[in-house]
Amino acid sequence: MGTLSPIARLGDTSDHGGTIITASTVVSCDGIGVAGQGDLHSCPIPGHGVTPLISGSDGKMADGLLIIRIGDIAECGAVVITGSPVSSST
């Protein structure tokens, strides 16, 4: 198995300047809720607004949702660019 991209969490950011605004209240990484497919991203680009995170990890799940990692995207096209510095495990 190879190294996976770091896990995205509540408050992590995107290349659109947005922020992940919902995440698990049960599963955490570094003490911060893990973002899953369907959690929400708030994008500051006019017309984008709040959209769900639509791509997810390679089968890894939290709360029944695919885990979001750096490189995954929101419905508005934003790419997640920050995540846990210690979660790049396989």
Annotate the PLM regions.
Residues 1-90:
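Intrinsically disordered, low-complexity proline/glycine-rich segments
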